Amino acid sequence: MMRVKAKKALGQHFLRDLSIAERIADTLSEHKALPVLEIGPGMGVLTQFLLRKGHDVRVIEIDGESVSYLREEFPELSDRIIEGDFLHYPLSELFPGGRQYCLIGNYPYNISSQIFFRLLDVREQIPCCSGMLQREVAMRLASPPGKKDYGILSVLLQLWYNIEYLFTVDASVFDPPPKVQSGVIRLTRNDRKELPCSEKALKTVVKTAFGQRRKTLRNSLRGILPAGFDRFDEPVFSKRPEQLSPDDFIALTLLLQQ
């Protein structure tokens, strides 16, 4: 049986612990009616449990060596193994007509944040996303307001998803072992259908505010304030960005658009 050599340039760290792989697969147990897209399956340690548990699985893998291994190891998946880059692949071709599906994966550390920005672009089709990533990033995504981990992605994802930090995974169960611990999270889409403000404006406010997170909003947002803005007496401007909830950022954006 062939094996795949982990490639540092692709951020590959292959999970060896089968019990952890099964626990990750179980994070989608309430969504078996929906197809699943696994990102970066590597040698299929998670894939095998998704299949055993009855999921309709598709996988997308950028590494040609891993793709060859998967096609040999999982012949029943041959037409559902996509060789490509999740960040740029036209996902509407896999799930046309707005079809709902779930995401899962042992996400490459070097692009984990980019994966979740891509999730935001296709969120209307994804009611649940779970998987493993660098613990620091996982904690950041799930962080509530007021914590040092709370940041841009925390706000933008929590606008649309409820995020749970499920458990920590030690570096020793990977080949090769990463230099940091990993964390498993689950995102479940909330009931929000649309925003009462411009989404583009909201993203600008959030990114600008956290770009100078030690400053109060009165100072950090000066560069994007509309001409003649005179509402600095509002209490929100004396706060720092990590003190604002996602809904607070919506209210702030509406205030700036008045």
Curated annotation (Swiss-Prot):
Taxon lineage: Bacteria, Pseudomonadati, Bacteroidota, Bacteroidia, Bacteroidales
NCBIfam families, alphabetized: ksgA
Gene3D superfamilies linked to this entry: Ribosomal RNA adenine dimethylase-like, domain 2, Vaccinia Virus protein VP39
Family stated for the protein in its record: Belongs to the class I-like SAM-binding methyltransferase superfamily. rRNA adenine N(6)-methyltransferase family. RsmA subfamily.
GO molecular function: 16S rRNA (adenine(1518)-N(6)/adenine(1519)-N(6))-dimethyltransferase activity; RNA binding
Subcellular location: Cytoplasm
Source organism: Porphyromonas gingivalis (strain ATCC BAA-308 / W83)
Binding site for S-adenosyl-L-methionine: H13, L15, G40, E61, D85, N106
Name of the molecule in the record: Ribosomal RNA small subunit methyltransferase A
Keyword Cytoplasm belongs to the record: yes
One term under GO cellular component: cytosol
EC numbers, comma separated: 2.1.1.182
Keywords, sorted A to Z: Cytoplasm, Methyltransferase, RNA-binding, rRNA processing, S-adenosyl-L-methionine, Transferase
Function: Specifically dimethylates two adjacent adenosines (A1518 and A1519) in the loop of a conserved hairpin near the 3'-end of 16S rRNA in the 30S particle. May play a critical role in biogenesis of 30S subunits.
Catalytic activity: adenosine(1518)/adenosine(1519) in 16S rRNA + 4 S-adenosyl-L-methionine = N(6)-dimethyladenosine(1518)/N(6)-dimethyladenosine(1519) in 16S rRNA + 4 S-adenosyl-L-homocysteine + 4 H(+)
HAMAP family with a match to the protein in the record: 16SrRNA_methyltr_A (MF_00607)
Main location: cytoplasm
